[in-house]
Amino acid sequence: MCRNLYEEYLFTLDREYLQEIFPVLEEHARFCSNMLQKTDKGLAVVPATSPENCFLDQGEAVPVALYTENTLAIIRNLFRDYLEACEVLKKEGALSGTIREQLPAIVLTQLGSDGRILEWNEEFTEVEVEHRHL
């Protein structure tokens, strides 16, 4: 989410460009901040789906879980980019303060019993057991 915009800044280090894209980063960060909810493991977007795979629940393919690593990874990345942009541009405010509090509270990446990153909030059986994620 906005990563391609921020990567252009990282490549060029053009502060004028960063100033131009900052409102986009900020509004996306605000949206994601408002979507986060408390779970027993931390903050997450609830519910969520994996964009490419489903898991089995009582033999049925299910696309929706409590939360997904894909969603949380995107938000973690966005929040880090936004906070870095705030520092570069010397823009601190209520939202950056909220994001600073929320970022470390987002559910950490979970590993399964076989060492793989869990796609969902639990170690479910995947519909596509040979799916390409590691």
Where are these regions (language model features)?
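Active-site core of glycosidic bond-cleaving carbohydrate-active enzymes
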Residues: 1-11, 15, 19, 23, ...
